[in-house]
Amino acid sequence: MLRRKQPNRFKTFYYAHPYFVIFNILIIYNIILIAVAALVMTYLMNGHTSGDVVMGLNIQSYLRNLEYCAVFTMNNGGIYNDAPLSVVIMKIILSILQMITFSGALIGLAASILQSMFNRRIHNVGKIKLKYHYVILEWSAVGPNLVRELSFMRGNKSIVILSDKDRDKIQEEIDNLFLETGTTKKHLKVFIKRGSPSSIRALREINIDKANAIAILGASSWLDSATQNDSASFKILMSVISITKKANIVIETDDQEVTRNIHNLMEASNDLKDAHISIFSRNTIVGHVLAKSAINANYPDLYYSLLSFRNGSFYSTDKDMSVEEALGKYSSCLPSFRYKCLNDKELLFFNAERERDIRKTLLKRKRATEAPFKKKISKSSFNLYVLGENDRSEAIAEAVRKHNELNEGKVNLKILPINNDIDDLLEDISKAKGRKKILILSDNNAKEENIDSNVFLSLIKIKANKELSQDIEVFAEIFEPSNRFSLETLNVSGVIIANQIVAVYMTQLLCHEESHKLYEDLLMPDNDSDIAFEIRQGKELLDCSNNLEFNSRGDFINALYISSKKEYLPIGFIGEQQKAKLTDVVTNVVSGAVSVTGKVISNIGNALTLSDSPEEVSIDFKDVLFLNKNLNKKDKIIIRPDTTMIVVHNKK
C-alpha cells in the first residue's frame, strides 16, 4: 500500500498566516544577528577592559557582549570606552543592520497591514455591519436604474450590491447613469461587494438577515438564456431563505410560467409559506406597458410617475373610512381608493409626497359636489404593427387581447419578425388601409455594444420610406436610457425604456410588500380588477365645452367623484413635455443621407450630435402634476375639453 504524501505544514501555515510568519522570521533573524555580533565582539575585546572587568574568550565575556549588542542604541553605557576602533565600527554596523532589517521591516510590515485594511474597507472585504439596508443580489442593466429610483426615497438610504461582476464596472455604470440624468446621490450610500450571490458565507457577510428589503435581479437581464437566468435567480432565493425570512424579497424572472411555478411552490412549501416574497416576470410587465403605450402615448408617463418616488407614492392605512369621508378631512394628501390586498384586508390608499402626510387630518370641510358629468369614452380602432419579435411579444399580444375585451376600441395586432428585408415589411404596411401605428422592439439578443441599434436602423428606414404616410405614429422600446432623447429628435411618438420600467416597478414592491397585487393591477388591468388607472381627456368625463372652473383642487376632485357616482376620481394631470438640455442636436434626418456603418455606437445619441460629449440630460418623462397636496388652497382649476387627466376608475 502506497503512503499518501502530506502537504508541507510550514508552507500551508505560511500561506494561511503570512504576516505572523514574516514577523516571527524577522525576530529570529535579529536574534541570530545579535548572537553572531556578540561572538565577534568577544573576539575583538579579548584582553581589553570593559569597565572594571577584563574581557576574555569565555562565556561570561560573551554574555556581557550579548547583553550590550541586544541594546538597540549607540549608547553602550561606557563598556566600550577603552575598546579598539574595530569594536566601535562593529557596533555601528550592527546598529545600522538592526535599523534596516528589523525596524525598517517592521515599519514596512505595519504599512502593508494598514494598506490591506484600507483595501478591505474600500473593496468591502469581510463583513459589512449594516442594518435596515437594501440589498441587490446579482447585477444587470436594471441595476443602475434601481439604485437611482431608490435614491428618490425620503431619508438616508444604504444599498449593498453583491455580485461576482467587476465592482469597478458596476460603480462606473451607476455613476454614468446619475451623471447622464443629472441626479444627485443625496442621503445615499452604495456599497459594492464582489462575491457569489448564492453563497451563504457572502450573504452573511453583507448582514442580509438585518436588511429591510432584498432585490434579486436576473443574472444578465435580457441578454442570456431565460431558463439559465431564472434557475440562477431561484438558487439565490433558496440561499437567502435559508438565512432570513423576515426581509421583503422581490425577485424578477424572464418567463411568466416560471413565475407561476414559484408561486405554486411557495404555497406548497412550509419553508416558503412564511417568507415575504414578491415575484414577477419582467417580460410580462414590459410587454403590457409597450402595448398600452402604443394604444395611448401618455401611458409611459403615467406608469413612471405613479411608480417613481420622485412625485410621491401610494401609502395605505387600515382606517375604517370611506374615500368620500376622507376627502373631507385631508388636505396634505389625496385619499384615492379602497383596495383589498393579498391578505384580503381592505385598506384605504392615499397618494402623498411623504408617508407622514397621511397622518395630518383636518376638521371636516364641505367641498363642491356637483360637476356636469357626461361619460363619453372615446374609442379608437387602428392597426398595430410590431417590428421585431422578442421575449415581450407574447405579453404584448395578451395586453392587446385584454384591451379589446374591455371594449375600448379595436386594435388589430400584427407581429412582424424582421427575418427579411425591412423594406418589404414597410411596403406591406403602406398598402394596408386604416389608421396605423408601428412599435419597434429592441433586439434582446444583440451584443452589449450594439444595444438598441436595430431600433435606430428600423426608424431610419421608416423615415426614409416615401410610401409610408408621415403621420404614422411610431413607438420604440429601448434598453439604454441615454438613447431616449436621440429617438425623440426623430419624432418618435413614444419611447419606453424597458430597464427603467422594471426598476420603478421593483422599487415599489421593495418598499410596499403588501401592495404587490395593487401594482400588478395598475400595470396589467383586466376585467377582474377592482380599479384601474386611466388617462382621460376632459371631454370624455365632463361636459366642458365652455370650460369648467373649480375654486380648489379639493373641489374639483370631490365634484367629479360624487357626480360620477364614485366611479372616477382624478389624481393628476399630464402636462407639457419636459425640455431636454441638448446642444447642437440634429433635428432633421435627410432621407437617404443617413447610413449606419459596421461600427455601431452604443450611445447612438452621440451619433446625432455635433458634440462628442453631449451635456447632461434627464431621461424622465413628461411633467405629471399630482393633486396630492394643498387640496384646500385657493387654486383655480380650469378643465378644458383637451385637458389630459389621470383618474382612478372604480369598477365595482
What are these regions (language model features)?
Residues M1-K652:
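Cytosolic regulatory regions of ion transport systems
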